[in-house]
Amino acid sequence: MVREKVTVSTRTLQWKCVESRTDSKRLYYGRFILSPLMKGQADTIGIAMRRALLGEIEGTCITRVKSEKVPHEYSTITGIQESVHEILMNLKEIVLRSNLYGTSDASICVKGPGYVTAQDIILPPYVEIVDNTQHIASLTEPIDFCIGLQIERNRGYLIKTPHNFQDGSYPIDAVFMPVRNANHSIHSYGNGNEKQEILFIEIWTNGSLTPKEALHDASRNLIDLFIPFLHMEEDNLYLQDNQHTVPLSPFTFHDKLAKLIKNKKKIALKSIFIDQSELSSRIYNCLKMSNIYTLLDLLNNSQEDLMKIEHFRSEDIKQILGILEKYFVIDLAKNKF
């Protein structure tokens, strides 16, 4: 078991593994921290991460058994101690690790008497067994135990249904989730407005992934879920005069506005807020003190009006004119009409 002392950074956001242990071949544990976070952020991240850990990570399972000698799932076979149902349940518990895409075939062919374990499964090269000692069946007589297996990589659950039963082929309820459990907790520190949070995440896996690998996969899946919001179609950004105005996000301001102007699309200027532009914080604060919040507010003032604002300089005017020209191909009047 590995433990590390928890230290809190007061500067950049960082994560760290503070505890890691292997309880068995099929049970790994890891504890991680992420800090420093502002109040409320830890719970937001913790809830999303737990759901991604339990529901979004793919795993590999045996999903079907093929044998022409088996009349039905609840039958028994001479020379085998376990019933067919018990063998199916043992196969369900086999933990596999793979980079498989879709489904693949495997098999078992053993001559009794003796024990059949996970190490007797003949697998494709890109699939491996986590625990070779897992028990499958006990052969009490010199019989041939030969079955075919279907292996699948997926996420969540796969529940067998009546139409999945085929002659000599038996589906297995599969639990693809490599994360057995995940919890998060929050520690707050600091006083008043300086209060910050540390997020603790605990992860238990079945051995097919380490907790660190599971955390990485869950994070990647969350990122992939949010990426479409960064590539919204331009049609979603057009606003009519009678529509409710909404602020455009920073990436919209920089990446989309130039294209909209070229396409001669009308934008509701009152929906574009000046804090989303490239203006310096000092210029923004000066404009805000003069009740200038949107691009429409700005265009209702001349250069002469802006120069009357306290602490406003000619260099500030130049910066504003540059942004208006770059993104909107419009100018700001020098004097009030």
Swiss-Prot record:
Keywords: Chloroplast, DNA-directed RNA polymerase, Nucleotidyltransferase, Plastid, Transcription, Transferase. It is an enzyme of class 2 (transferase). GO terms for molecular function: DNA binding; DNA-directed RNA polymerase activity; protein dimerization activity. GO terms for biological process: DNA-templated transcription. The keyword Transferase applies. InterPro entries: DNA-dir_RNA_pol_insert, DNA-dir_RNA_pol_RpoA/D/Rpb3, DNA-dir_RpoA, RBP11-like, RNAP_asu_C, RNApol_insert_sf. It is found in: Plastid, Chloroplast. Residues 1-233 are annotated as: Alpha N-terminal domain (alpha-NTD). GO terms for cellular component: chloroplast; DNA-directed RNA polymerase complex; mitochondrion. It catalyses: RNA(n) + a ribonucleoside 5'-triphosphate = RNA(n+1) + diphosphate. Residues 265-337 are annotated as: Alpha C-terminal domain (alpha-CTD). NCBIfam families: rpoA. DNA-dependent RNA polymerase catalyzes the transcription of DNA into RNA using the four ribonucleoside triphosphates as substrates. The N-terminal domain is essential for RNAP assembly and basal transcription, whereas the C-terminal domain is involved in interaction with transcriptional regulators and with upstream promoter elements. Belongs to the RNA polymerase alpha chain family. In plastids the minimal PEP RNA polymerase catalytic core is composed of four subunits: alpha, beta, beta', and beta''. When a (nuclear-encoded) sigma factor is associated with the core the holoenzyme is formed, which can initiate transcription. HAMAP family: RNApol_bact_RpoA. This is DNA-directed RNA polymerase subunit alpha. It comes from Solanum tuberosum (Potato). The gene is rpoA.
